[in-house]
Amino acid sequence: MKQIFKVVAQSDTFHVPSQKAEGGQISKCNIVLQEPGGKYENSYVATILDEQANIRFAKDDLVVAALRFSTREYNGQVYQDIVVNEIFKIKN
């Protein structure tokens, strides 16, 4: 899903262990994205990984983002994960 979103909030970047990363750690942050149109539009809490996690976005920035949705089951509960594949700020 590639779409235009408004940035609602972004967490600080932190590092988590990863066997797939060269240095054994991967950068990660969470971002809240909202579809344009008003305060009651759909919002998504997504994870940004790797180098893109170091890019800072301000509240109300307009961005184009490609999101990947997946689900997983853990202890009988089903969880949805949303990962940002790519994200670009739209210049005003």
How would you label these PLM feature ranges?
Residues 1-92:
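Single-stranded nucleic acid-binding surfaces, predominantly the OB-fold ssDNA-binding core
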